[in-house]
Amino acid sequence: MELNKGKSLLAGVAVLFSGALLTACGQSKGASEKLVLNWMTSAEIITMDPSKATDATSFTQMENTMEGLYQLDKDNQAKEALATKAAQSKDGLTWTFDLRKDGKWSNGQAVTAKDFVYSWQRTVNPKTASQYSYIFSGIKNADAIVAGKKAPSSLGVKALGKYKLQVKLDHKLPYFKLLLAFPVFFP
């Protein structure tokens, strides 16, 4: 009789455990649609401003929450992110990028070519004092703008349409796509 009580108790525990497991795995109809991601960093995030960032933690967080024209794949090769297509002129000095139309800011507004123009002009503007403005060297007029000799609006970047961006270079940059994956070039 003791054996039957033990089997009954074991069966009861198994049924309760199975029920609890199935209840935990099931999704109720009233479940919230809101998804939350908790993220930890090894250090305080100094800024999420691409023009102002200088530390690895800030750059890592931007890479995890934003996109530029390109991103680096597992082999550190540039692959399209917000860019869907890139065309380079025969002389290698003009690049034209078509942007994804589904790119959105956190408030739901579309990411457009004008956002890139604004961000890049802001980064090279001496008033912004970006420590990474030098990395724009090679883009038309960037060096003169950083030196305070030309207006930021003369930077070789232009919105040709809502989702079409043109970049003019002073000289060929064989590594240009790789540069565009760096957060300083994010919108």
Question: Model-derived features: where do they sit?
Answer:
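N-terminal lobe/hinge region of extracytoplasmic solute-binding protein
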Residues: 41-90
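C-terminal motif of bacterial Sec signal peptides marking the signal peptidase cleavage site
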Residues: 22-24
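Aromatic- and charge-enriched surface segment that lines or borders ligand/interaction sites
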Residues: 85-132
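Short, well-ordered beta-strand elements
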Residues: 33-46, 84, 94-97, 116-119, ...
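Bacterial signal peptide processing site
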Residues: 26-28
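Surface-exposed binding/hinge segments that line
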Residues: 132-187
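Extracytoplasmic/secreted proteins, especially bacterial periplasmic and envelope-associated proteins
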Residues: 61-64, 77, 81, 111, ...
